[in-house]
Amino acid sequence: RMLFNNRERFFKYLNCILVGLPIWYFIGLIVANSELIWANALNVQGKVVNGTALMYAYIGLSVGDVFSGIISQVLRSRRKVVFLYLGFSTVLMTYYLFFANGISVQGFYILSFLVGCATGYWAIFVTIAAEQFGTNIRSTVTNTTPNFVRGSVPLITMLFQFLTAQTVS
């Protein structure tokens, strides 16, 4: 209730959630559906296996998380690191959707790894969410923000399907 009865606090909370959405867009929609959707859509040369694509993405997530912490220490700013990672994610998504047609299966797995690296700012995302609020609601925000982000995958999927249907027809 304390999060929702103050407009400024609510929008701060909503912004914290929105920062984490690209992570699960990439992992929950793009990489998790590599074999069923993206391998055919991108005309991947070879057989893509979801488990392998997810493995490379999660290795990338781990690498990205380590480097996001190091970079935030060097830059002395978590916010700059999140913007840097979001920019890297945008570049990779543009490549993924518009320029990866006919990619080899090995190239696809490398791309999955890079997507993981680009979305490997989970620890910083949770830390930023926790630091935005005072002691009374910090625990609530720290626990619920990642849950809302993970829980958004069905909504992201429905929106993606809707937009795909609009652009294909």
Label each PLM-derived region with a short phrase.
Residues 38-39, 71-72, 160-168:
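Interfacial helix-cap and linker-helix signal at transmembrane-aqueous boundaries
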Residues 130-166:
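A late C-terminal transmembrane helix in Major Facilitator Superfamily
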Residues 8-62, 153-157:
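Extracytoplasmic gate region of multi-pass secondary transporters
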